[in-house]
Amino acid sequence: MADFKTYEYIWLDGYTPEANMRSKVKATDEDTAPDWSFDGSSTQQAEGGSSDCLLLPVQTYSNPNGHDLVLTQVQAADHTTHPSNFRAAAAEVVTDEWWFGFEQEFFFTDPKTGEPLGCLLYTSDAADEIVR
């Protein structure tokens, strides 16, 4: 029996003003994550009559849960850059000299008041400069 690898493909959908993360899982005997397709009509990336979109792997990371996480970019069925693929536009202007990233912050809040729970400070630095 062949050894199978499991890949979880992750991409951004076409919802605006903010895209959502999407994923789907593929089990295959291939050593690297292959290109894959999905129905873009359910992710705001295609019309119902012609809904195929392509997922092209960009970077793969090992996951402690036993499958690989595959960050992808979306292309239309004709292999052109999909309008929701902002990574392709960024790749055109970024060189090896540039670094950029995304930071996502999380705060626990009281569901009744919406106020942050716990410490009032974002970090412990500059605690003496906080004015209440």
What residue ranges belong to the model's regions?
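Residue-level marker of positions within ordered structural domains that often coincide
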Residues: 14, 24, 111, 128-129
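Single conserved hydrophobic/aromatic residue that forms the stacking wall/gate
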Residues: 122-131
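Short, conserved secondary-structure transition motifs
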Residues: 105-114
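Acidic/polar, glycine-rich intrinsically disordered N-terminal extensions of enzymes
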Residues: 1-93
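Enzymes and membrane/adaptor proteins characterized by extended Gly/Ser/Thr/Asp/Glu-rich
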Residues: 113-121
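Flexible, glycine/charged-enriched surface loops at secondary-structure junctions
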Residues: 96-103
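Acidic-residue sensor for enzyme active/binding pockets
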Residues: 103-105, 129
